[in-house]
């Protein structure tokens, strides 16, 4: 067999096909072969050992979403900082200045949201 540009990806394609097949096959097998014994007690909701009270859908305060978005922003910053730190010497001053601009932009954004009161939990 003559190697083609896609030959190195053949094992990956086989693994992906097998994983996809198993992901479809296993739920089908359990659905068809598993026991079905519905009862009233199984249909009730259960929450931490006590009966649930109130509606299942409740509104969350916006501050939770703001904190979650800030976490994602600074988590992405950490993802960008790692490769930069690994290649710090190879990048030289240009890489240093680029990362400095990136970090300063994030710090300015943090100061802005701090001044706007987005991190003030009591308000």
From Swiss-Prot:
Its EC number is 7.1.1.-. The keyword Cell inner membrane applies. GO terms for molecular function: NADH dehydrogenase (ubiquinone) activity; NADH:ubiquinone reductase (non-electrogenic) activity; quinone binding. The chain crosses the membrane at residues 6-26, 66-86, 93-113. It is found in: Cell inner membrane. Pfam families: Oxidored_q4. The keyword Metal-binding does not apply. It comes from the Bacteria. GO terms for cellular component: NADH dehydrogenase complex; plasma membrane. Keywords: Cell inner membrane, Cell membrane, Membrane, NAD, Quinone, Translocase, Transmembrane, Transmembrane helix, Transport, Ubiquinone. Its main location: membrane. It catalyses: a quinone + NADH + 5 H(+)(in) = a quinol + NAD(+) + 4 H(+)(out). It is an enzyme of class 7 (translocase). InterPro entries: NAD(P)H_OxRDtase_bac/plastid, NADH_UbQ/plastoQ_OxRdtase_su3, NDAH_ubi_oxred_su3_sf. It is a multi-pass membrane protein. Belongs to the complex I subunit 3 family. NDH-1 is composed of 14 different subunits. Subunits NuoA, H, J, K, L, M, N constitute the membrane sector of the complex. NDH-1 shuttles electrons from NADH, via FMN and iron-sulfur (Fe-S) centers, to quinones in the respiratory chain. The immediate electron acceptor for the enzyme in this species is believed to be ubiquinone. Couples the redox reaction to proton translocation (for every two electrons transferred, four hydrogen ions are translocated across the cytoplasmic membrane), and thus conserves the redox energy in a proton gradient. This is NADH-quinone oxidoreductase subunit A. The lineage of its organism: Bacteria, Pseudomonadati, Myxococcota, Myxococcia, Myxococcales.
